[in-house]
From Swiss-Prot:
It comes from Penicillium rubens (strain ATCC 28089 / DSM 1075 / NRRL 1951 / Wisconsin 54-1255). InterPro entries: Coatomer_complex_subunit, Dynein_regulator_LIS1, G-protein_beta_WD-40_rep, LIS1_N, LisH, PAC1-like_LisH-like_dom, WD40/YVTN_repeat-like_dom_sf, WD40_repeat_CS. Disulfide bonds: none annotated. Keywords: Cell cycle, Cell division, Coiled coil, Cytoplasm, Cytoskeleton, Microtubule, Mitosis, Repeat, Transport, WD repeat. This is Nuclear distribution protein nudF 2. Residues 9-41 form the LisH domain. The gene is nudF-2.
Length: 464
């Protein structure tokens, strides 16, 4: 067996052994060891060995003490980890049935804006939320302790939308405005405005980072959807098929598809991974302008399996949803067929979001309510939170999930992303967020200039 010691280290070890054997009168063993290790009496005599007499014992005692300290430290570390798990925020409670959790009442109210809040976005790693307002500013909040971290100024008209994205340059915040521009803010450099993207000819109503890449999509009243490279700021692709204001866009979690919708009352699904965007379907059915859209996570597929065509594989944008001024929400399959219509709101549907567990769809409206629709019960409204705001509710977002690092047991925040466009039916339940823990936190913004934060609390007995 080859030694891991250098020749010098091996010689020093042999000298220590000789000194130990000599000091303890083990003459026969000493003679045998000298012969085996090639250390004759004239090379390392008793006088020289005296200098090494206690070296072996000291090293052994030192290593033993170090090992005891290491074991004690590991035990203390385990105790601290158990204490941390017992005191972690309720919204990270592993014992809670997070797939069935629904909001009950706001635990935080963030107030500082001087005009309507038009948009919100959660930071993918930290307990931060960005909000954009008609007061021309973007504000960054710590939603856990309700503190205003900073205010970003730069837009000259109302801020219409914000979104965080994890890019090769780090985490960026994108904002768009009625001033026709898009701004990129570097979150790692005090939110410095690093780029301003110009190319739209009218109000830019929505921005969304495309997962698994350095792309940003934007939608505008100029009837265009533009894809941008956020590293160099160049326009990559332009979609010009809409015949009215494009109000909202939503990418699939694998970055292969983009959903767009707006005032022309159409829903369009684009394959944006192609060299030129390919329209997979154009659907109609709403009776008024469409204000919002969302792509369902793969975790929703099993709850809507009876509505989907049976085939060997599916795409990441198998199910999509839209909300309209006609007060309804519609769900669509990947062919543009309406598979479900949800009615119950008394006014415009402003924003929608799928529960990460896939079972529910949440919506907010100008009727000041948040509604929760159970997709496993034909879209029945199972919960309605009245007067969630003191005015129209304009936006709704669910916090990104937490990816567990199984190598060391630590938790890190992760976007929902997947590399393949074609997904085997047997893998659908795994694809939504593989290895990702759902966080029971969501937020809404309204014309009352407030952000409401909803989260699972320790005393929540009922999830619905």
């Amino acid at each position: 067996m080859p030694s891991s010691l250098t020749p010098q280290q091996a010689a020093e070890l042999n000298k220590s052994i000789i000194a130990y054997l000599s000091a303890h009168g083990l003459a026969e063993t000493l003679a045998a060891f000298r012969k085996e290790s090639d250390f004759p009496d004239n090379m390392f005599d008793a006088t020289a060995a005296k200098q090494y007499e206690n070296l072996l014992e000291r090293k052994w005692t030192s290593n033993s003490t170090l090992m005891k300290k290491l074991l004690a430290l590991e035990s203390h570390n385990k105790a601290l980890r158990n204490e941390l798990n017992s005191t972690r925020p309720s919204f990270l409670n592993r014992n809670a049935d997070v797939n069935d959790w629904l909001p009950q009442h706001p635990i935080r109210s963030l107030e500082s804006h001087r005009d309507s809040i038009n948009c919100i976005a959660f930071h993918p790693k930290y307990s931060l939320i960005a909000s954009g307002s008609g007061d021309l500013t973007i504000r960054i909040w710590d939603w856990e302790d309700s503190t205003l971290e900073r205010t970003l100024k730069g837009h000259t008209m109302a801020v219409c939308d914000v979104d965080y994205g994890d890019t090769s340059s780090g985490i960026l915040l994108a904002s768009c405005s009625s001033d026709f521009t898009i701004k990129l803010w570097d979150t790692t450099d005090d939110y410095k405005n690093v780029k301003t993207l110009r190319g739209h000819d009218h109000i830019v109503s929505a921005v969304r980072f495309i997962p698994s890449g350095n792309l940003l999509a934007s939608a505008s009243r100029d009837m265009k959807v533009i894809l941008w490279n956020v590293i160099n700021g160049y326009r990559v692709k332009t979609i010009e098929d809409h015949t009215g204001w494009v109000r909202d866009i939503s990418p699939s979690f694998d970055g292969q598809f983009l959903l767009s919708t707006g005032d022309d009352m159409t829903v369009r699904l684009w394959e944006i991974s192609a060299s030129q965007p390919i329209c997979k379907f154009t659907a109609t059915g709403h009776e008024n302008r469409i204000l919002c859209c969302a792509v369902a996570p793969a975790t929703s597929f099993r709850y809507l399996a009876s509505f989907l065509e049976s085939r060997g594989s599916t795409i990441a944008a198998e199910i999509t949803a839209t909300g309209s001024r006609d007060k309804s929400i519609k769900l669509w399959d990947s062919h543009g067929r309406c598979i479900m219509t949800l009615t119950g709101h008394a006014s415009w549907v402003r924003a929608i979001a799928f529960h990460p567990g896939g079972k529910y769809l949440l919506s907010v409206s100008d009727d000041k309510t948040m509604r929760c629709w159970d997709l496993s019960q034909q879209g029945r409204c199972v919960k309605s939170i009245s007067n969630a705001h003191d005015g129209f509710i304009t936006c709704l977002k669910w916090v990104p999930g937490i990816a567990k690092d199984t190598r060391n047991g630590t938790m890190t925040i992760s976007y929902q992303r997947k590399g393949s466009a074609e997904l085997p039916r047997s893998k659908l339940d795994e694809v939504g967020q593989p290895g990702v823990q759902i966080r029971c936190v969501l937020a809404t913004g309204g014309e009352d200039q407030k952000i409401r934060v909803f989260a699972l609390q320790a005393n929540d007995r009922s999830h619905k």
